[in-house]
Swiss-Prot record:
Source species: Mycolicibacterium smegmatis (strain ATCC 700084 / mc(2)155) (Mycobacterium smegmatis)
Subunit: Monomer.
Name this polypeptide is given: Dihydroorotate dehydrogenase (quinone)
Record: residues binding FMN: A67, G68, F69, D70, K71, T91, N144, N177, K213, T241, G265, G294, Y315, T316
Gene that specifies this protein: pyrD
Subcellular location: Cell membrane
UniProt-listed CDD domains: DHOD_2_like
Superkingdom classification of source: Bacteria
Length: 354
């Protein structure tokens, strides 16, 4: 209830400005080790039933912070203390870039959603590498890499490889982002003919698990082709899904006036869940599936786990849910695991579709 009141006040200011304020506050309150430890005792996932080892990495809890919130790895120490089981930083590109002009982030409160056209604004993979070298985190940190906007499509492979080379030794896993709608031509790289050389080259460059992040707007046949390619190349998994360009069924007035961008949150939940189930039926346990998109409650999280997700991610749910959101999700998952007779998280993964 308190956060709802605070959220109403925060929502009076422009979304990106509030993001800067809140992110600075989160870093400040977790900067000192004693305070960070105290927060972790209250919020961090400590129930052993939530822990799992996925693609060789130990995760204390399945819910992670999705890419986009901490683009440059400035909050590495914060996320474990705030209850997340891991965090994915980025998206970063080989070269620093400013992203698209502001305003570029909007709230859709009637839809519990966000619309963004950030355009991969970031300080570059080199700057993130330096920060990861200096920083400390109590949880796994994955990195999400994208294509520099000015890099032509025919040079995309080299662009992704540059980022992978810089970040390889510093990340717990690497996610290749070819699915943001906010970089011109990026989603064209999801076509298997274009995607194959990118994924193969990144995998050859890094010793860490490599995953690919896909869009919810792909056709079912395209999803199947990417899944088959990921298995063929020996990828660790797929992150499903990114934001949607669809405007179907939105309730917030004036959305058309906000312009282009990708929508996250509740409107993408149904399609993200559909894509997850399709992927799990296609690949089973051959790939790790990370589900992201419209997860708001423990019931949502549980549905994704039993539908095949080994790990989960959230961003918009965190914005609307507040600082206790990750803890509430993890506590709910633990309760459902025990209520359903599971002794480990991995036993529950895909149990509804097997």
């Amino acid at each position: 209830m308190m956060y709802r009141v605070l959220r109403r006040a925060l929502f009076l200011a422009p979304a990106e400005r509030v993001h800067v304020w809140v992110f600075a506050l989160l870093r400040a309150v977790t900067w000192a080790a004693p305070l960070r430890a105290a927060l972790a005792r209250l919020l961090a996932p400590r129930d052993p039933i939530l822990a799992s080892t996925v693609f060789g990495v130990h995760f204390p809890g399945p819910l992670g912070l999705a890419a986009g919130f901490d683009k440059n790895g400035r909050g590495l120490a914060a996320w474990g203390a705030l209850g997340f089981g891991y965090a994915e930083v980025g998206t970063v590109t080989a070269q620093p870039q400013p992203g698209n002009p502001a305003p570029r982030l909007f709230r859709l409160p009637d839809d519990h959603a966000l619309l963004n056209r950030m355009g991969f604004n970031n300080e570059g993979a080199g700057a993130l590498a330096q920060r990861l070298t200096r920083g400390k985190s109590d949880i796994p940190i994955g990195v999400n890499i994208g294509k520099t906007k000015v890099t032509p499509a025919e040079e995309a492979v080299a662009d992704y490889v540059t980022s992978a080379r810089l970040l390889n030794s510093l990340a717990s896993f690497v996610v290749v982002n070819v699915s943001s709608p906010n970089t011109p031509g990026l989603r064209d790289l999801q076509a298997v003919a274009a995607l194959r050389p990118i994924l193969a080259a990144v995998k050859a460059e890094t010793t860490k698990p490599v995953l690919v992040k896909i869009a919810p707007d792909l056709s079912d046949s395209d999803i199947d082709e990417i899944a088959d390619l990921a298995v063929e190349l020996g990828l660790a998994g797929i992150v499903a899904t990114n934001t949607t360009v669809s405007r179907d069924g939105l309730l917030t007035p004036g959305v058309a006036d906000l312009g282009p961008g990708g929508i996250s949150g509740r409107p993408v939940a149904r399609r993200s869940a559909e894509v997850l189930r399709r992927l799990y039926r296609r690949v089973g346990d051959k790939l790790v599936l990370i589900s992201v998109g419209g997860i708001e409650t423990a019931d949502d999280a549980w549905e994704r786990i039993v539908s095949g997700a080994s790990l989960l991610q959230g961003y918009t749910g965190f914005i609307y849910g507040g600082g206790l959101w990750a803890k509430h999700i993890h506590d709910g998952i633990a309760g459902r695991l025990r209520a359903c007779g599971f002794t480990t998280l991995s036993e529950a993964v895909g149990s509804a579709v097997r």
